Protein backbone atom coordinates (compact mmCIF):
# COMPACT_ATOMS: atom_id res chain seq x y z
CA UNK A 1 0.00 0.00 0.00
CA UNK A 2 1.35 3.41 -0.93
CA UNK A 3 2.27 5.75 1.95
CA UNK A 4 -0.41 8.21 3.00
CA UNK A 5 -0.08 11.64 1.40
CA UNK A 6 -2.05 14.82 2.05
CA UNK A 7 -3.78 16.45 -0.87
CA UNK A 8 -2.47 19.91 -0.15
CA UNK A 9 0.13 21.79 1.78
CA UNK A 10 -1.49 22.66 5.10
CA UNK A 11 0.43 25.93 5.28
CA UNK A 12 -1.20 27.43 2.19
CA UNK A 13 -4.87 26.88 1.47
CA UNK A 14 -5.78 27.71 -2.16
CA UNK A 15 -8.30 30.46 -2.77
CA UNK A 16 -11.18 29.86 -5.17
CA UNK A 17 -10.68 31.96 -8.33
CA UNK A 18 -13.45 33.44 -10.44
CA UNK A 19 -14.50 30.50 -12.65
CA UNK A 20 -14.04 30.72 -16.39
CA UNK A 21 -17.09 30.66 -18.59
CA UNK A 22 -17.90 29.12 -21.95
CA UNK A 23 -20.90 29.50 -24.24
CA UNK A 24 -23.49 26.86 -25.01
CA UNK A 25 -22.47 23.69 -26.83
CA UNK A 26 -24.49 20.79 -28.28
CA UNK A 27 -27.37 23.10 -29.17
CA UNK A 28 -27.78 24.61 -25.71
CA UNK A 29 -30.74 23.65 -23.46
CA UNK A 30 -32.81 22.29 -26.36
CA UNK A 31 -29.90 20.15 -27.52
CA UNK A 32 -29.39 18.93 -23.95
CA UNK A 33 -33.03 17.84 -23.79
CA UNK A 34 -32.74 15.99 -27.10
CA UNK A 35 -29.50 14.27 -26.08
CA UNK A 36 -30.76 13.23 -22.64
CA UNK A 37 -33.87 11.51 -23.97
CA UNK A 38 -32.83 10.79 -27.54
CA UNK A 39 -29.59 8.90 -26.95
CA UNK A 40 -31.05 6.51 -24.39
CA UNK A 41 -33.95 5.84 -26.77
CA UNK A 42 -31.46 5.24 -29.58
CA UNK A 43 -29.68 2.51 -27.61
CA UNK A 44 -32.92 0.63 -27.08
CA UNK A 45 -33.83 1.07 -30.77
CA UNK A 46 -30.51 -0.32 -31.97
CA UNK A 47 -30.97 -3.28 -29.61
CA UNK A 48 -34.50 -4.14 -30.76
CA UNK A 49 -34.15 -3.40 -34.48
CA UNK A 50 -31.10 -5.67 -34.95
CA UNK A 51 -31.92 -8.89 -33.16
CA UNK A 52 -32.01 -12.68 -33.12
CA UNK A 53 -35.80 -12.81 -33.49
CA UNK A 54 -36.35 -11.68 -37.09
CA UNK A 55 -33.14 -10.18 -38.45
CA UNK A 56 -30.82 -7.22 -38.75
CA UNK A 57 -32.53 -4.98 -39.60
CA UNK A 58 -36.03 -6.23 -38.80
CA UNK A 59 -37.81 -7.02 -42.11
CA UNK A 60 -40.58 -4.42 -41.70
CA UNK A 61 -38.08 -1.57 -41.94
CA UNK A 62 -37.26 -2.64 -45.50
CA UNK A 63 -40.94 -2.67 -46.48
CA UNK A 64 -42.29 0.67 -45.24
CA UNK A 65 -45.46 0.40 -47.35
CA UNK A 66 -46.63 -2.56 -45.25
CA UNK A 67 -45.14 -1.35 -41.96
CA UNK A 68 -47.42 -1.51 -38.94
CA UNK A 69 -46.68 -0.97 -35.27
CA UNK A 70 -47.93 -4.41 -34.25
CA UNK A 71 -45.82 -6.14 -36.90
CA UNK A 72 -42.76 -4.08 -35.95
CA UNK A 73 -43.16 -4.95 -32.27
CA UNK A 74 -43.48 -8.65 -33.13
CA UNK A 75 -40.35 -8.64 -35.30
CA UNK A 76 -38.39 -6.60 -32.75
CA UNK A 77 -39.12 -9.03 -29.94
CA UNK A 78 -40.98 -6.37 -27.96
CA UNK A 79 -41.92 -7.87 -24.55
CA UNK A 80 -45.60 -8.58 -23.91
CA UNK A 81 -45.41 -6.67 -20.61
CA UNK A 82 -44.25 -3.57 -22.50
CA UNK A 83 -41.96 -1.03 -20.85
CA UNK A 84 -42.45 -2.71 -17.48
CA UNK A 85 -40.25 -5.58 -18.68
CA UNK A 86 -37.33 -3.20 -19.24
CA UNK A 87 -36.61 -3.14 -15.50
CA UNK A 88 -35.84 -6.04 -13.22
CA UNK A 89 -34.85 -5.67 -9.56
CA UNK A 90 -32.71 -8.81 -9.54
CA UNK A 91 -30.77 -7.71 -12.62
CA UNK A 92 -30.24 -4.23 -11.16
CA UNK A 93 -28.86 -5.71 -7.93
CA UNK A 94 -26.36 -7.80 -9.89
CA UNK A 95 -25.30 -4.80 -11.96
CA UNK A 96 -24.79 -2.79 -8.75
CA UNK A 97 -22.71 -5.69 -7.41
CA UNK A 98 -20.41 -5.32 -10.41
CA UNK A 99 -19.93 -1.64 -9.57
CA UNK A 100 -19.25 -2.45 -5.92
CA UNK A 101 -16.67 -5.06 -6.92
CA UNK A 102 -14.90 -2.52 -9.12
CA UNK A 103 -14.94 -0.02 -6.25
CA UNK A 104 -13.56 -2.54 -3.75
CA UNK A 105 -10.70 -3.45 -6.09
CA UNK A 106 -9.90 0.25 -6.56
CA UNK A 107 -9.71 0.83 -2.81
CA UNK A 108 -7.79 -2.24 -1.70
CA UNK A 109 -5.47 -3.07 -4.59
CA UNK A 110 -2.18 -1.15 -4.57
CA UNK A 111 -1.77 1.47 -7.26
CA UNK A 112 0.33 4.30 -8.60
CA UNK A 113 -0.47 7.78 -7.23
CA UNK A 114 -0.06 10.54 -9.82
CA UNK A 115 -0.57 14.30 -9.73
CA UNK A 116 -2.94 15.82 -12.26
CA UNK A 117 -2.49 18.99 -14.27
CA UNK A 118 -2.52 22.35 -12.49
CA UNK A 119 -5.97 23.70 -11.68
CA UNK A 120 -7.16 27.29 -11.91
CA UNK A 121 -6.66 27.63 -8.14
CA UNK A 122 -3.01 26.59 -8.70
CA UNK A 123 -3.38 23.28 -6.89
CA UNK A 124 -3.04 19.75 -8.23
CA UNK A 125 -5.26 16.79 -7.46
CA UNK A 126 -3.82 13.35 -6.89
CA UNK A 127 -5.12 10.21 -8.52
CA UNK A 128 -4.69 6.54 -7.72
CA UNK A 129 -4.42 4.26 -10.74
CA UNK A 130 -4.88 0.48 -10.62
CA UNK A 131 -7.54 -0.16 -13.27
CA UNK A 132 -5.37 -2.67 -15.15
CA UNK A 133 -4.77 -5.10 -12.24
CA UNK A 134 -8.45 -4.70 -11.29
CA UNK A 135 -9.49 -5.67 -14.82
CA UNK A 136 -7.07 -8.60 -14.90
CA UNK A 137 -8.53 -9.99 -11.66
CA UNK A 138 -12.11 -9.71 -12.92
CA UNK A 139 -11.27 -11.19 -16.32
CA UNK A 140 -9.30 -13.94 -14.58
CA UNK A 141 -12.35 -14.85 -12.52
CA UNK A 142 -14.47 -14.98 -15.67
CA UNK A 143 -11.86 -17.15 -17.37
CA UNK A 144 -11.96 -19.57 -14.44
CA UNK A 145 -15.75 -19.72 -14.57
CA UNK A 146 -15.62 -20.37 -18.32
CA UNK A 147 -13.03 -23.12 -17.83
CA UNK A 148 -15.31 -24.84 -15.33
CA UNK A 149 -18.68 -24.33 -17.06
CA UNK A 150 -17.88 -23.47 -20.67
CA UNK A 151 -20.17 -21.24 -22.71
CA UNK A 152 -22.99 -21.99 -20.24
CA UNK A 153 -21.17 -20.11 -17.46
CA UNK A 154 -23.88 -18.21 -15.62
CA UNK A 155 -22.35 -14.77 -16.28
CA UNK A 156 -22.48 -15.28 -20.05
CA UNK A 157 -26.06 -16.53 -20.11
CA UNK A 158 -27.16 -13.81 -17.68
CA UNK A 159 -25.73 -11.03 -19.85
CA UNK A 160 -27.33 -12.27 -23.06
CA UNK A 161 -30.72 -13.18 -21.57
CA UNK A 162 -31.11 -9.92 -19.60
CA UNK A 163 -29.48 -7.49 -22.01
CA UNK A 164 -32.30 -4.92 -22.08
CA UNK A 165 -32.68 -4.98 -18.29
CA UNK A 166 -28.91 -4.50 -17.91
CA UNK A 167 -29.09 -1.42 -20.15
CA UNK A 168 -31.86 -0.04 -17.92
CA UNK A 169 -29.91 -0.73 -14.73
CA UNK A 170 -26.87 1.14 -16.03
CA UNK A 171 -29.10 3.97 -17.24
CA UNK A 172 -30.61 4.32 -13.76
CA UNK A 173 -27.15 4.37 -12.19
CA UNK A 174 -25.95 7.02 -14.61
CA UNK A 175 -28.98 9.26 -13.94
CA UNK A 176 -28.71 8.93 -10.15
CA UNK A 177 -24.99 9.68 -10.29
CA UNK A 178 -25.51 12.74 -12.50
CA UNK A 179 -28.21 14.09 -10.16
CA UNK A 180 -25.98 13.54 -7.11
CA UNK A 181 -23.01 15.34 -8.66
CA UNK A 182 -25.17 18.20 -9.93
CA UNK A 183 -26.79 18.79 -6.52
CA UNK A 184 -23.46 18.54 -4.72
CA UNK A 185 -21.83 21.07 -7.06
CA UNK A 186 -23.72 23.91 -5.33
CA UNK A 187 -21.51 23.43 -2.25
CA UNK A 188 -18.36 24.50 -4.14
CA UNK A 189 -16.73 27.50 -2.39
CA UNK A 190 -17.54 30.90 -3.89
CA UNK A 191 -14.81 32.99 -5.58
CA UNK A 192 -12.41 34.45 -3.02
CA UNK A 193 -13.20 31.78 -0.41
CA UNK A 194 -10.71 29.16 0.85
CA UNK A 195 -10.74 26.05 -1.32
CA UNK A 196 -8.84 23.33 0.55
CA UNK A 197 -10.46 20.48 -1.42
CA UNK A 198 -9.55 22.07 -4.79
CA UNK A 199 -13.14 22.00 -6.04
CA UNK A 200 -13.95 24.03 -9.14
CA UNK A 201 -16.78 24.76 -11.51
CA UNK A 202 -16.28 23.61 -15.10
CA UNK A 203 -15.99 26.52 -17.55
CA UNK A 204 -18.98 25.34 -19.58
CA UNK A 205 -21.12 24.04 -16.73
CA UNK A 206 -22.46 27.08 -14.90
CA UNK A 207 -24.58 28.79 -17.54
CA UNK A 208 -27.49 29.25 -15.14
CA UNK A 209 -29.79 26.97 -17.14
CA UNK A 210 -30.46 23.97 -14.89
CA UNK A 211 -31.16 21.45 -17.65
CA UNK A 212 -28.09 22.40 -19.66
CA UNK A 213 -25.80 22.49 -16.62
CA UNK A 214 -27.11 19.10 -15.47
CA UNK A 215 -26.34 17.69 -18.91
CA UNK A 216 -22.92 19.26 -19.48
CA UNK A 217 -21.70 19.03 -15.86
CA UNK A 218 -21.26 21.86 -13.32
CA UNK A 219 -18.32 20.55 -11.31
CA UNK A 220 -14.88 19.80 -12.66
CA UNK A 221 -13.38 16.62 -11.18
CA UNK A 222 -16.09 15.87 -8.56
CA UNK A 223 -14.77 13.66 -5.78
CA UNK A 224 -16.05 11.74 -2.79
CA UNK A 225 -14.15 10.31 0.16
CA UNK A 226 -15.22 6.91 1.42
CA UNK A 227 -15.40 6.52 5.22
CA UNK A 228 -12.68 3.86 5.36
CA UNK A 229 -10.17 4.80 8.08
CA UNK A 230 -7.56 2.08 7.54
CA UNK A 231 -6.54 2.92 3.96
CA UNK A 232 -4.54 5.88 2.69
CA UNK A 233 -6.21 9.05 1.43
CA UNK A 234 -5.59 8.27 -2.23
CA UNK A 235 -7.33 4.90 -1.87
CA UNK A 236 -10.45 6.24 -0.20
CA UNK A 237 -10.77 9.26 -2.53
CA UNK A 238 -12.84 8.55 -5.64
CA UNK A 239 -12.59 10.92 -8.58
CA UNK A 240 -16.01 10.16 -10.03
CA UNK A 241 -15.20 11.19 -13.59
CA UNK A 242 -11.93 9.28 -13.92
CA UNK A 243 -13.28 6.24 -12.05
CA UNK A 244 -16.33 5.99 -14.30
CA UNK A 245 -14.30 6.55 -17.46
CA UNK A 246 -11.65 3.93 -16.76
CA UNK A 247 -13.53 1.18 -14.95
CA UNK A 248 -17.14 -0.10 -15.16
CA UNK A 249 -17.95 0.99 -18.71
CA UNK A 250 -14.69 0.13 -20.44
CA UNK A 251 -14.38 -3.28 -18.82
CA UNK A 252 -18.11 -3.85 -19.22
CA UNK A 253 -17.68 -3.36 -22.98
CA UNK A 254 -15.19 -6.24 -23.12
CA UNK A 255 -17.24 -8.47 -20.83
CA UNK A 256 -20.26 -8.00 -23.11
CA UNK A 257 -18.10 -8.95 -26.11
CA UNK A 258 -17.05 -12.13 -24.34
CA UNK A 259 -20.66 -12.98 -23.54
CA UNK A 260 -21.44 -12.54 -27.26
CA UNK A 261 -18.70 -15.03 -28.15
CA UNK A 262 -20.16 -17.50 -25.66
CA UNK A 263 -23.60 -17.04 -27.20
CA UNK A 264 -22.25 -17.78 -30.68
CA UNK A 265 -20.67 -20.97 -29.38
CA UNK A 266 -23.85 -22.07 -27.57
CA UNK A 267 -25.86 -21.55 -30.75
CA UNK A 268 -23.56 -22.92 -33.44
CA UNK A 269 -21.00 -25.05 -31.60
CA UNK A 270 -18.05 -23.08 -32.96
CA UNK A 271 -16.51 -19.59 -32.85
CA UNK A 272 -15.80 -17.61 -36.04
CA UNK A 273 -12.61 -15.71 -36.79
CA UNK A 274 -14.63 -12.52 -37.34
CA UNK A 275 -15.98 -12.31 -33.80
CA UNK A 276 -12.58 -13.24 -32.38
CA UNK A 277 -10.84 -10.58 -34.46
CA UNK A 278 -13.27 -7.82 -33.51
CA UNK A 279 -13.10 -8.78 -29.83
CA UNK A 280 -9.30 -8.99 -29.81
CA UNK A 281 -8.93 -5.51 -31.30
CA UNK A 282 -11.44 -4.00 -28.90
CA UNK A 283 -9.88 -5.77 -25.93
CA UNK A 284 -6.43 -4.58 -26.94
CA UNK A 285 -7.72 -1.01 -27.13
CA UNK A 286 -9.22 -1.23 -23.64
CA UNK A 287 -6.24 -2.94 -22.00
CA UNK A 288 -3.89 -0.46 -23.65
CA UNK A 289 -5.99 2.40 -22.24
CA UNK A 290 -5.89 0.82 -18.79
CA UNK A 291 -2.12 0.28 -19.02
CA UNK A 292 -1.69 3.94 -19.97
CA UNK A 293 -4.26 5.03 -17.38
CA UNK A 294 -2.38 8.15 -16.15
CA UNK A 295 -2.59 9.57 -19.70
CA UNK A 296 -6.29 10.26 -19.04
CA UNK A 297 -5.23 13.24 -16.91
CA UNK A 298 -4.31 15.27 -20.01
CA UNK A 299 -7.59 14.61 -21.85
CA UNK A 300 -10.34 17.18 -22.35
CA UNK A 301 -12.77 15.04 -20.35
CA UNK A 302 -10.65 15.63 -17.24
CA UNK A 303 -9.05 19.06 -17.65
CA UNK A 304 -12.02 20.94 -19.18
CA UNK A 305 -15.35 19.10 -18.98
CA UNK A 306 -17.55 18.97 -15.93
CA UNK A 307 -19.06 15.65 -14.93
CA UNK A 308 -22.76 15.69 -15.72
CA UNK A 309 -25.28 13.51 -17.48
CA UNK A 310 -23.29 13.64 -20.72
CA UNK A 311 -20.18 11.98 -19.30
CA UNK A 312 -22.08 9.77 -16.87
CA UNK A 313 -24.19 8.39 -19.72
CA UNK A 314 -21.21 8.20 -22.05
CA UNK A 315 -19.00 6.26 -19.65
CA UNK A 316 -21.59 3.89 -18.17
CA UNK A 317 -24.18 3.34 -20.92
CA UNK A 318 -23.02 4.52 -24.35
CA UNK A 319 -19.58 2.89 -24.33
CA UNK A 320 -20.52 -0.66 -23.28
CA UNK A 321 -23.83 -0.92 -25.16
CA UNK A 322 -22.94 0.88 -28.39
CA UNK A 323 -19.39 -0.40 -28.71
CA UNK A 324 -20.34 -4.10 -28.47
CA UNK A 325 -22.89 -3.98 -31.32
CA UNK A 326 -20.46 -5.57 -33.80
CA UNK A 327 -19.83 -8.70 -31.75
CA UNK A 328 -23.50 -8.91 -30.80
CA UNK A 329 -24.29 -8.96 -34.53
CA UNK A 330 -21.66 -11.64 -35.17
CA UNK A 331 -22.99 -13.77 -32.31
CA UNK A 332 -26.13 -14.26 -34.41
CA UNK A 333 -24.59 -14.19 -37.90
CA UNK A 334 -21.38 -16.30 -37.78
CA UNK A 335 -19.27 -14.80 -40.56
CA UNK A 336 -15.94 -16.40 -41.55
CA UNK A 337 -13.36 -14.01 -43.01
CA UNK A 338 -10.96 -14.88 -45.81
CA UNK A 339 -7.21 -14.43 -45.36
CA UNK A 340 -6.98 -11.29 -47.49
CA UNK A 341 -9.79 -9.70 -45.49
CA UNK A 342 -7.98 -10.46 -42.25
CA UNK A 343 -4.73 -8.99 -43.59
CA UNK A 344 -6.52 -5.80 -44.66
CA UNK A 345 -8.03 -5.37 -41.21
CA UNK A 346 -4.65 -5.99 -39.56
CA UNK A 347 -2.98 -3.39 -41.77
CA UNK A 348 -5.56 -0.70 -41.00
CA UNK A 349 -5.41 -1.43 -37.28
CA UNK A 350 -1.61 -1.46 -37.15
CA UNK A 351 -1.38 1.89 -38.91
CA UNK A 352 -3.97 3.40 -36.58
CA UNK A 353 -2.27 2.12 -33.45
CA UNK A 354 1.17 3.33 -34.54
CA UNK A 355 -0.20 6.84 -35.08
CA UNK A 356 -2.37 6.89 -31.94
CA UNK A 357 0.11 5.54 -29.43
CA UNK A 358 3.17 7.16 -31.00
CA UNK A 359 1.55 10.61 -30.98
CA UNK A 360 0.17 10.33 -27.45
CA UNK A 361 3.44 9.02 -26.02
CA UNK A 362 5.30 11.85 -27.69
CA UNK A 363 2.87 14.43 -26.28
CA UNK A 364 2.99 13.02 -22.75
CA UNK A 365 6.79 12.83 -22.68
CA UNK A 366 7.12 16.36 -24.00
CA UNK A 367 4.68 17.73 -21.43
CA UNK A 368 6.34 15.94 -18.53
CA UNK A 369 9.93 16.69 -19.48
CA UNK A 370 10.83 18.58 -22.69
CA UNK A 371 14.51 17.88 -21.92
CA UNK A 372 13.96 14.11 -22.20
CA UNK A 373 16.67 12.80 -24.61
CA UNK A 374 13.92 11.22 -26.72
CA UNK A 375 12.45 14.68 -27.25
CA UNK A 376 15.66 16.51 -28.19
CA UNK A 377 14.84 16.40 -31.92
CA UNK A 378 11.40 17.97 -31.45
CA UNK A 379 10.97 21.54 -32.67
CA UNK A 380 8.48 23.76 -30.90
CA UNK A 381 7.06 27.26 -30.53
CA UNK A 382 7.49 28.98 -27.18
CA UNK A 383 4.23 30.80 -26.38
CA UNK A 384 3.77 33.92 -24.28
CA UNK A 385 1.76 31.86 -21.77
CA UNK A 386 4.83 29.70 -21.11
CA UNK A 387 3.60 26.60 -22.94
CA UNK A 388 5.45 24.92 -25.78
CA UNK A 389 3.68 23.83 -28.98
CA UNK A 390 5.34 21.03 -30.95
CA UNK A 391 5.77 21.68 -34.68
CA UNK A 392 7.68 18.54 -35.65
CA UNK A 393 7.41 14.80 -35.06
CA UNK A 394 3.88 13.42 -35.05
CA UNK A 395 2.44 16.78 -34.06
CA UNK A 396 4.05 18.51 -37.00
CA UNK A 397 1.90 16.43 -39.37
CA UNK A 398 -1.47 17.56 -38.00
CA UNK A 399 -2.68 19.45 -34.94
CA UNK A 400 -4.72 16.45 -33.75
CA UNK A 401 -2.92 13.58 -35.43
CA UNK A 402 -3.83 11.25 -32.54
CA UNK A 403 -7.50 11.50 -33.55
CA UNK A 404 -6.65 10.05 -36.96
CA UNK A 405 -5.00 7.04 -35.32
CA UNK A 406 -7.91 6.58 -32.96
CA UNK A 407 -10.41 6.63 -35.83
CA UNK A 408 -8.39 4.21 -37.99
CA UNK A 409 -8.26 1.74 -35.12
CA UNK A 410 -12.04 1.90 -34.80
CA UNK A 411 -12.36 0.47 -38.33
CA UNK A 412 -11.12 -2.86 -37.00
CA UNK A 413 -14.24 -3.16 -34.83
CA UNK A 414 -16.66 -2.88 -37.76
CA UNK A 415 -14.76 -4.35 -40.72
CA UNK A 416 -15.04 -7.95 -39.41
CA UNK A 417 -18.83 -7.70 -39.87
CA UNK A 418 -18.34 -7.27 -43.63
CA UNK A 419 -21.29 -6.16 -45.77
CA UNK A 420 -23.71 -6.71 -42.93
CA UNK A 421 -27.34 -7.79 -42.83
CA UNK A 422 -29.24 -11.01 -42.15
CA UNK A 423 -32.72 -12.47 -41.90
CA UNK A 424 -33.84 -15.08 -39.38
CA UNK A 425 -35.67 -18.02 -40.93
CA UNK A 426 -37.31 -20.92 -39.14
CA UNK A 427 -37.06 -24.51 -40.27
CA UNK A 428 -37.50 -28.01 -38.89
CA UNK A 429 -34.31 -29.98 -38.33
CA UNK A 430 -33.78 -33.72 -38.71
CA UNK A 431 -34.99 -34.30 -35.15
CA UNK A 432 -38.28 -32.61 -35.88
CA UNK A 433 -37.49 -29.57 -33.76
CA UNK A 434 -37.98 -25.98 -34.88
CA UNK A 435 -34.70 -24.15 -35.37
CA UNK A 436 -33.75 -20.60 -36.29
CA UNK A 437 -31.02 -19.75 -38.77
CA UNK A 438 -29.50 -16.41 -39.77
CA UNK A 439 -29.01 -16.09 -43.53
CA UNK A 440 -28.05 -13.19 -45.77
CA UNK A 441 -30.32 -12.48 -48.72
CA UNK A 442 -29.87 -9.82 -51.42
CA UNK A 443 -32.73 -7.82 -49.88
CA UNK A 444 -30.98 -7.33 -46.52
CA UNK A 445 -27.34 -7.32 -47.65
CA UNK A 446 -25.74 -4.04 -46.63
CA UNK A 447 -28.64 -2.76 -44.51
CA UNK A 448 -27.12 -4.25 -41.38
CA UNK A 449 -24.20 -1.86 -41.78
CA UNK A 450 -26.46 0.85 -40.35
CA UNK A 451 -25.92 -0.96 -37.05
CA UNK A 452 -22.45 -2.49 -37.30
CA UNK A 453 -20.82 0.62 -38.78
CA UNK A 454 -22.78 3.09 -36.66
CA UNK A 455 -19.90 3.30 -34.20
CA UNK A 456 -17.51 4.22 -36.99
CA UNK A 457 -19.63 7.17 -38.16
CA UNK A 458 -20.41 8.32 -34.62
CA UNK A 459 -16.78 8.13 -33.54
CA UNK A 460 -15.60 10.14 -36.54
CA UNK A 461 -18.20 12.83 -35.81
CA UNK A 462 -17.19 12.86 -32.15
CA UNK A 463 -13.52 13.35 -32.98
CA UNK A 464 -14.29 16.20 -35.40
CA UNK A 465 -16.42 17.86 -32.70
CA UNK A 466 -13.65 17.45 -30.13
CA UNK A 467 -11.14 18.87 -32.57
CA UNK A 468 -13.36 21.93 -32.99
CA UNK A 469 -13.55 22.38 -29.22
CA UNK A 470 -9.78 22.01 -28.97
CA UNK A 471 -9.31 24.68 -31.61
CA UNK A 472 -11.55 27.18 -29.81
CA UNK A 473 -9.83 26.52 -26.50
CA UNK A 474 -6.36 26.96 -27.99
CA UNK A 475 -7.31 30.13 -29.87
CA UNK A 476 -8.53 31.63 -26.61
CA UNK A 477 -5.51 30.45 -24.63
CA UNK A 478 -2.66 31.22 -27.02
CA UNK A 479 -4.01 34.09 -29.14
CA UNK A 480 -1.51 35.19 -31.80
CA UNK A 481 0.80 32.32 -30.87
CA UNK A 482 -1.91 29.92 -32.03
CA UNK A 483 -2.21 31.75 -35.34
CA UNK A 484 1.54 31.40 -35.81
CA UNK A 485 1.33 27.72 -34.89
CA UNK A 486 -1.52 26.97 -37.32
CA UNK A 487 0.36 28.71 -40.11
CA UNK A 488 3.11 26.10 -39.63
CA UNK A 489 1.00 23.02 -38.83
CA UNK A 490 -1.87 23.55 -41.28
CA UNK A 491 -3.70 20.22 -41.13
CA UNK A 492 -6.22 19.56 -38.39
CA UNK A 493 -6.56 15.74 -38.31
CA UNK A 494 -5.64 14.19 -41.68
CA UNK A 495 -2.30 15.50 -43.04
CA UNK A 496 -2.82 17.40 -46.28
CA UNK A 497 -6.57 16.68 -46.40
CA UNK A 498 -8.31 18.03 -43.30
Swiss-Prot record:
Q: Which GO terms describe its cellular component?
A: endoplasmic reticulum membrane
What InterPro entries does the record point to?
Answer: ERG24_DHCR-like, Sterol_reductase_CS
Does the keyword field hold Glycoprotein? yes
Chain segments annotated as transmembrane: 30-50, 91-111, 136-156, 163-183, 275-295, 302-322, 339-359, 444-464
Name the pathway it acts in.
Steroid metabolism; ergosterol biosynthesis
- Superkingdom, according to UniProt? Eukaryota
Q: Name one GO biological process term.
A: ergosterol biosynthetic process
Per UniProt, the keywords (alphabetical) are: Endoplasmic reticulum, Glycoprotein, Lipid biosynthesis, Lipid metabolism, Membrane, NADP, Oxidoreductase, Steroid biosynthesis, Steroid metabolism, Sterol biosynthesis, Sterol metabolism, Transmembrane, Transmembrane helix
Q: Its biological function?
A: Delta(14)-sterol reductase; part of the third module of ergosterol biosynthesis pathway that includes the late steps of the pathway. Catalyzes the reduction of the C14=C15 double bond within 4,4,24-trimethyl ergosta-8,14,24(28)-trienolto produce 4,4-dimethylfecosterol. The third module or late pathway involves the ergosterol synthesis itself through consecutive reactions that mainly occur in the endoplasmic reticulum (ER) membrane. Firstly, the squalene synthase erg9 catalyzes the condensation of 2 farnesyl pyrophosphate moieties to form squalene, which is the precursor of all steroids.
The name on file for this protein is: Delta(14)-sterol reductase erg24A
Q: Which organism is it from?
A: Aspergillus fumigatus (strain ATCC MYA-4609 / CBS 101355 / FGSC A1100 / Af293) (Neosartorya fumigata)
Amino acid sequence: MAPRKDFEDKATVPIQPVPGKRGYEFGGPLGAFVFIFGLSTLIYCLTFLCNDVSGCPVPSLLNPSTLSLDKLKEEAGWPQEGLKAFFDVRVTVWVLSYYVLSLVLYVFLPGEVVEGTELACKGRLRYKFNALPSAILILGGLALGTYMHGADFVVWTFLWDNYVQIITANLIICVVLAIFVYARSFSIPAPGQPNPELRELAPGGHSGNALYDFFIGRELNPRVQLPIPFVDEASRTIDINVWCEMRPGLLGWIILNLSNIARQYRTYGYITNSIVLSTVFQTFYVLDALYMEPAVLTTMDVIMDGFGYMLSFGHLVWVPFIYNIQTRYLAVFPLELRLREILLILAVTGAGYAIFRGANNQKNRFRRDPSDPRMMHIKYIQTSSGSKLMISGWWGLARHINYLGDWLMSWSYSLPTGIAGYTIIESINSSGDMQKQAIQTPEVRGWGMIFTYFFLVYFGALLIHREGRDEEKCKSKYGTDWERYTSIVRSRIIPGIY
